[in-house]
Amino acid sequence: MRLKYLAFLITAFLFSELPTLSAARGIHALQLQRAYPALIGRETNNIVELKVTAEEEGHAIKSLQFDFKGTDELHDIGSMTLFLGGPEGQLTTEWSVGTANTPADRLIFSRRITLKKGDNWFWLSCKLKSTASLLHHIDVECSQIETTAGLIKPEDKMPGRKIRIGYALCQQGQGGTHTYRIPAVTRAKDGSLLAFYDMRHNRTKDLQEDIDIGLSKSTDGGQTWSEPRPIMDRGEWGGLPQDQNGISDPGVIVDPKTGKIFVWAVWMYGKPGKHQWNGDGSEAGYEIGKAAQMLLAVSKDHGETWSELQNVTRDLKKEEWVLFAPAPQNGITLSKDGTLVMPVQGRNAAGAPFSTIMSSKNHGRSWKVGNPTGEISSECQAVELLDGSVMLNMRSSRDKAHMHRAVMVLSLIHI
């Protein structure tokens, strides 16, 4: 009985010495973390957000404390800045609470900040060193907020979440290109990583516009990358300017046996202000300037050099189809016999969108195009199932009010 009583006294004493971190009167806080990585090469990376809600005017924050004890390597971090967010939680950078240039297990930002009645937003940003490892994680928690009403420990809405480290491969304005979009990533036979994308030189918009297909390459598992360079560029073909010779939507597949890399893209010639998916932006038949064209570039040396552009429209597109184009994204290789399978899309004779696949059993020397799935769909991805069939996951536009996914399994007969 004495031991139990003594234990109770010690426990009561210990807890009486700890500061109370339940919500201070009239103030409570939430911690939120997004499910996306912090990127090497970016000036700001959102690693944690705080919503501090005051029930009335007159309260203020004195300090905010952040713990990084679960972070794999603190020296991956170059600096951290705490910002005051916008009224709706926008990640604004107009007002900085403070910056820490030396990583540590615990950071305390001491500054008096008057709280308005209602929600007050804060977000912690980190800038990563160029040497930060892609295998590492950042583990951050706002462990304490000191206010004029007392101490608060924010409620964590995503407990246990860690932030992965990534690499900002292409950023808006990099190399003079306005926007990079439509990425496709694959691994070459020598282990190199290859990233393909639209290089949208003038603006964000789709075709018709000055767009080339670009490439960045990594030979160290994605830790560093080469600068973007175009591999599919029509220039001023046919005497028309580059903004009437746009190439977009890369689709890529690597033959694991030969190492050949095939990249397809859709090319529009002329038709300024039009889009291949709308109206007469593309037309039936094969005529350049009327029908959007399917182009192919091939590399035999792991993406170092590329063939001249090949126009394969007549080889693949049915004449009555309005459009035939890459899905885009990645193809797959069937495990049983090495068949190459590439998801593709298009518009049928009535102009309605469709999805299907094309396949090659001779390492890309020739390709067989499947029939449209029958679903009103477009962009799609393929995966091989255990029985060797191919499941096609498609963006469906059957219900115009709500975009949905549609799934169809194609048997070996279709391949």
Feature-to-residue mapping (PLM):
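Bacterial N-terminal signal peptides
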Residues: 7-17
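Sec/Tat signal peptide C-region and signal peptidase I cleavage site
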Residues: 18-22
